[in-house]
């Protein structure tokens, strides 16, 4: 996966760097290590579906008929949601975040991003959304096995909103409230979506 990613690393960097425009590297090794980091992360993303499929093949013999039926659609849905989360973050959240922070520029104060620092910001901002978008799938699976109900989710709504902002503060690449809110809001919307879908499923 890493070899494939490295082959296309220039294209990947062009895509990832687009929201910020021109960047600089402050240390002789900074550009090289940024290339390596993007290649490794890209390789992990490429390899993830294969790894998950191998894990599924390993545990499949021990599953019940009901669990096997459920697992047939879990993997493709999980991969799809992860991809949607990445795309959502890149096209909507990341440009808004970059624009917000560049808005502090003045005639005397101009932004000059380091490629290493910017790439750390991008990866720590974009990748978590892939996992955040798995939330509906996790909650629906728990509901499928009667471990939670839509009523339970309704009663825990306020707690989840608080948890969303705490998670936003933990995984946000910067300590400001804007970044935390940009992470927390999609989590809350996904929670409400999960609640709605779970309520529909339970009525059937």
Model regions and ranges:
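Membrane topogenic/interface segments and analogous intrinsically disordered interaction regions
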Residues: 1-204
């Amino acid at each position: 996966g890493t070899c494939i990613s490295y082959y296309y690393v220039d294209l990947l960097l062009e895509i990832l760097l687009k929201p910020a425009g021109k960047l600089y590297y402050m240390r002789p090794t900074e550009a090289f290590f940024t290339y390596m980091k993007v290649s490794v992360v890209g390789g992990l993303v490429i390899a993830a579906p294969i790894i998950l499929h191998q894990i599924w093949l390993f545990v499949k013999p021990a599953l019940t008929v009901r669990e096997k039926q459920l697992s047939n659609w879990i993997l493709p849905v999980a991969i799809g949601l992860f991809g949607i989360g990445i795309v959502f973050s890149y096209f909507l959240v990341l440009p808004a975040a970059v624009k917000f922070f560049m808005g502090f520029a003045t005639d005397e104060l101009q932004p000059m991003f380091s490629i290493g620092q910017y790439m750390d910001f991008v990866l720590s901002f974009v990748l978590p959304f892939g996992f955040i978008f798995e939330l509906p799938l996790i909650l629906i699976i728990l509901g499928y096995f009667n471990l939670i109900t839509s009523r339970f989710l309704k009663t825990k709504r306020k707690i989840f909103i608080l948890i969303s902002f705490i998670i936003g503060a933990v995984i946000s690449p910067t300590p400001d409230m804007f970044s935390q809110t940009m992470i927390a809001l999609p989590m809350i919307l996904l929670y409400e979506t999960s609640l709605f879908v779970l309520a529909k499923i339970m009525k059937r």
